[in-house]
């Protein structure tokens, strides 16, 4: 797979068609993906993407990447940084279209994001979380060397659910670092960060 900064025309058809959803429900509230009206679902989702872009600083930013397979958009992978300039920590959020799940793409796209954050941006630690019954996401974290980091509670579709938290340090990532992931445009982004 290939990831590129999100362009608004690539992914809305998947959101509109409900291909981002799964059972058990994987997203916490409020989540635009739970909207029953397809147009409202797309509109609210795009608003959240643009909100993330609008709150940008060297400390706090959200980078949204479209995931492409053979040139076709199949999902999204976000890098979410808070206090990045002082702590070097970040989290991730992702989704895949229902018709490409179970092929290892979740692991590949998270691997690409980790490579960007650690090798490209100099991050020190990655965090992730998922509802305990989100087997796919939790398996990806475990496969990539994340360590369990406690449990918490969150709300999904109005009901409480247990969350599994994960953390991956730079030193652990280094032992699993891949040499087949290429980064492009990172120096320009780092320059942009330095000037804001």
Stretches with model-predicted labels:
Residues 10, 109, 136:
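Charged catalytic carboxylate motif
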Residues 128-138:
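Conserved beta-strand-loop-alpha-helix junction that forms the acyl-donor binding cleft
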Residues 127-129, 145-163:
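Conserved catalytic-core motifs of GNAT/GCN5-like acyltransferases
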Residues 1-99, 116, 120, 154-196:
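GNAT-family acyltransferases
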Residues 119-129:
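Conserved GNAT acetyl-CoA-binding A-motif
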Residues 136-140, 144-147, 171:
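Surface-exposed, gly/pro-biased binding rims or lids
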Residues 71, 104, 134:
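Conserved G/P- and acidic residue-centered "switch" motifs that form tight phosphate/ATP-binding loops
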Residues 95-96, 102-117, 139-143:
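Conserved acetyl-CoA-binding loop-helix of GNAT-fold acetyltransferases
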């Amino acid at each position: 797979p290939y990831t590129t900064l999100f362009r608004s025309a690539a992914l809305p058809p998947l959101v509109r068609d409900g291909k981002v959803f799964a059972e058990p429900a994987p997203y916490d509230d409020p989540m635009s993906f739970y909207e029953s009206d397809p147009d409202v679902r797309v509109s609210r989702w795009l608003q959240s993407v643009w909100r993330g872009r609008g709150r940008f600083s060297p400390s706090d930013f959200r980078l949204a990447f479209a995931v492409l397979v053979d040139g076709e958009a199949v999902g999204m992978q976000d890098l979410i940084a808070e206090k990045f300039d002082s702590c070097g920590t970040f989290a991730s959020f992702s989704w895949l279209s229902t018709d490409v799940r179970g092929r290892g793409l979740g692991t590949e796209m998270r691997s690409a994001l980790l490579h960007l954050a650690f090798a490209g941006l100099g991050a020190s630690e990655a965090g992730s979380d998922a509802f305990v019954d989100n087997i796919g996401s939790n398996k990806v974290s475990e496969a990539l060397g994340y360590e369990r980091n406690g449990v918490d509670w969150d709300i999904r579709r109005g009901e409480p659910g247990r969350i599994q938290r994960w953390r991956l340090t730079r030193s652990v990532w280094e032992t699993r670092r891949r040499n087949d992931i290429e980064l492009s445009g990172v120096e320009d982004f780092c320059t942009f960060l330095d000037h804001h």
